[in-house]
Design a protein with these regions (language model features):
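Non-catalytic signal-transmission and effector/linker regions of two-component phosphorelay proteins
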Residues: 1-32, 39, 136-151
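Two-component/phosphorelay signaling modules centered on CheY-like receiver
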Residues: 37-57
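Acidic, metal-coordinating helix/loop segments flanking the phosphotransfer/catalytic sites
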Residues: 45, 58-76
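Active-site residues of response regulator receiver
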Residues: 80-82
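Short amphipathic alpha-helix used as the core "switch/output" element in two-component signaling
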Residues: 89-103
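Hydrophobic/aromatic residues positioned on beta-strands within the core alpha/beta folds
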Residues: 108-109
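As written
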Residues: 119-129
Length: 151
């Protein structure tokens, strides 16, 4: 959200009017988007809606993600590994969401996941998404995450 040329980084509660009909073979998820780039967040929000999922919130930082998670149930978080700022990076955020709220994470990055080494394993991700990505890539990553979550 922008006003007067500045980005508003308050958490957004998106639990109403954001769910479309999910397919019978794919349960709808309540997804928390943790991304500090507004355009990427908005793209993911649109893709998730198109795929029949609900966006439970959008957070640009670890602290905001924890605040949203404390007040709004989420089944999954899509977390940018390169998250900057308030409280830690995306791996720290994924670990905190899992440990404090039981929310698994699908991690996304523009870097190679191999470059991130063992640290990424501490987040115990249910999937990965490499930037840049398409709607189809997001759908594939979500389907993989759903398969792990229901297994």
């Amino acid at each position: 959200m922008q006003s007067e040329g500045r980005v508003d980084h308050r958490p957004i509660n998106m639990t109403s009017n954001t769910q479309t009909t999910a397919s019978p073979d794919r349960p709808p998820l309540r997804v928390l988007i943790v991304e500090d780039e507004t355009l990427i967040s908005l793209f993911l929000q649109d893709v998730l809606r198109d795929l029949g999922h609900t966006v439970s919130g959008i957070a640009p930082s670890l602290r905001t993600a924890l605040a949203v998670a404390a007040g709004t149930p989420s089944d999954l978080a899509i977390v940018d590994v390169g998250l900057a700022g308030d409280g830690g990076d995306g791996i720290d955020t994924a670990v905190a969401l899992r440990e404090r709220h039981g929310i698994p994470s699908l991690l996304m990055t523009g870097a190679s996941f191999a470059e991130l080494g063992e640290r990424i394993q501490s987040a115990d991700p249910v999937g990965f998404l490499t930037k840049p990505y398409t709607e189809s890539d997001v759908e594939s990553a979500l389907n993989g995450a759903i398969a792990k979550l229901v297994a």
